[in-house]
A protein has these predicted regions:
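Membrane-proximal intracellular helices of multi-pass ion channels
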Residues: 1-248
Length: 248
C-alpha cells in the first residue's frame, strides 16, 4: 500500500508532458538544423522559434518556409504541427490514462461528468476515436484540396494538399507558399475546404462524437459542453462576418 502511494507521488503527468514537449522541441531543432534541411543558413534562434511555433500550432515564423527550408525541413515541421495538434486533443486523455490502471469507478464518474462523456466511456476507445477522427477528416481534406490544386495547375498538388490540410486542421496557419494562401483569395472552393478543416480541428473530437451519439440514439440529448461550443462558435462566426463585411 505504501509502495503504491509512493509511486503515485513520484509519477507526475504534468512534468512528463512538459519534458516530453521539450524533448520533441530539441529533436525538432536538431533535425531542422541539418544542412540538407535548409535552403539557406538558418540561425539557431530562428530554428527554435519555428519549431516551438509548429509544436504549439501558433503559425508564426521568422521568414518564408519556402525560402528557408528544403522539402525535408518542411516535412519535419509538418510532423511537429501534427504532433502538436494531436497532443492538444489528447492531452486530457493522456493525463487520465497515466493513472488508468489505478483509477476507481468513482473517479471515472467524476471524469465522465467533468468532460461531458458517457458514464461508461472507455478511455482507450476514446483516444483511438480521436486518432480515427483526425485521419478521416485530414484524408477528406487532402483529397478535396488535391483536386482543387490540380485544377489550378499547381506543382506537387498532393504534397501541397497534405501540408495545408494538416496545417488547417491543426489551426496552425503554416504555408509552404511565400504569400501564404493569398493566391487562393478568390477561389471559393479552396477557402471553403480550408474553413471546414479549421472548424473541424477547432471544435475538437468531442463535439462531432456527441452529435453522432445523439443522431444514432445512443444518448438522449446533446451535452451542455457541446451546446456551449456550438453556440459560441456560431456567434463568433456571425459577429466576425458582420464586422468584416461592414468594414469592407
Amino acid at each position: 500500500m505504501k509502495r503504491t502511494k509512493l509511486k503515485d507521488k513520484e509519477v507526475n503527468p504534468f512534468k512528463t508532458i512538459l519534458f516530453g514537449f521539450l524533448g520533441y522541441v530539441i529533436i525538432g531543432v536538431a533535425l531542422i538544423s541539418l544542412p540538407f534541411a535548409q535552403k539557406i543558413p538558418v540561425g539557431f534562434v530562428d530554428n527554435l522559434f519555428n519549431v516551438v511555433s509548429a509544436m504549439s500550432t501558433t503559425g508564426l515564423t521568422t521568414g518564408s518556409l519556402s525560402d528557408m527550408y528544403t522539402p525535408f525541413g518542411k516535412i519535419i515541421l509538418l510532423g511537429l504541427i501534427q504532433l502538436g495538434a494531436i497532443g492538444y486533443m489528447t492531452l486530457t486523455s493522456f493525463l487520465i490514462l497515466s493513472t488508468s490502471k489505478k483509477i476507481s469507478t468513482h473517479r471515472v464518474k467524476i471524469l465522465s461528468a467533468e468532460f461531458s462523456m458517457p458514464e461508461n466511456f472507455d478511455l482507450k476507445h476514446f483516444i483511438s476515436n480521436i486518432i480515427i477522427y483526425t485521419i478521416i477528416v485530414e484524408f477528406i481534406g487532402t483529397v478535396l484540396l488535391c483536386i482543387e490544386f490540380s485544377k489550378l495547375g499547381l506543382q506537387k498538388p498532393l504534397w501541397s494538399a497534405i501540408f495545408h490540410c494538416v496545417s488547417a486542421f491543426s489551426t496552425a496557419g503554416f504555408s509552404i507558399y511565400a504569400d501564404g494562401l493569398c493566391r487562393f483569395q478568390n477561389d471559393v472552393s479552396v477557402n471553403l475546404i480550408i474553413a471546414f478543416l479549421c472548424y473541424a480541428g477547432a471544435i475538437g473530437f468531442i463535439v462531432p462524437m456527441d452529435i453522432y451519439r445523439r443522431l444514432t440514439h445512443k444518448s438522449k440529448e446533446i451535452t451542455f459542453t457541446t451546446k456551449i461550443i456550438l453556440f459560441i462558435t456560431v456567434m463568433i462566426t456571425l459577429t466576425g462576418s458582420v464586422i468584416y463585411i461592414g468594414s469592407s
